[in-house]
Design a protein with these regions (language model features):
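Acidic/aromatic-lined carbohydrate-recognition and catalytic surfaces
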Residues: 2-136
Length: 136
């Protein structure tokens, strides 16, 4: 197709199931802002959804995000909530959906100060105020 006939954004593909995904490993050296800048390119490829690795706060220095230490916060090292909102806006503008890998059964536990709820459960067991956070 000649460049002049090539759409600049894909039709709205945010409804329904993904028909094609493109996976991005968001990490500190390729944060949410950089990922957002891919939106028009991905739309031109004809995919329906961007698929990302976990975006929640992970162990300091994590390159993959599967060692979550705060299940309630977008990782500041990736751009935080501001970065997530920018990504969402860019994808919306390009008519793309978003699939985020979540890992409720994974946690980074190596550093007590990074995951105090887990360490409190280790110390206090079922009497911990965080016992219901985990399957113990």
């Amino acid at each position: 197709m000649p460049p002049s006939d090539h759409p600049t954004t894909a039709p709205d593909r945010t409804e329904g199931l993904p028909s094609g995904t493109y996976r991005v490993q968001v990490r500190p050296d390729f944060p949410l802002k950089a990922t957002a800048e891919l939106a028009d390119y991905l739309a031109d490829l004809g995919i329906s959804h961007l698929y990302t690795a976990p975006l929640l706060t992970a162990t300091l220095g994590s390159e993959h995000g599967y060692d979550v230490v705060d299940h309630g916060q977008v990782n500041p090292a990736l751009g935080g909530e501001e970065g997530r909102l920018a990504l969402r806006a860019a994808l919306d503008g390009a008519g793309l959906g978003l699939v985020i890998d979540i890992v409720p059964n994974h946690a980074g536990v190596g550093v007590p100060s990074a995951n105090p709820t887990w360490w409190d459960v280790l110390k206090h067991g079922e009497q911990s105020e965080y016992a219901t956070f985990y399957d113990i």
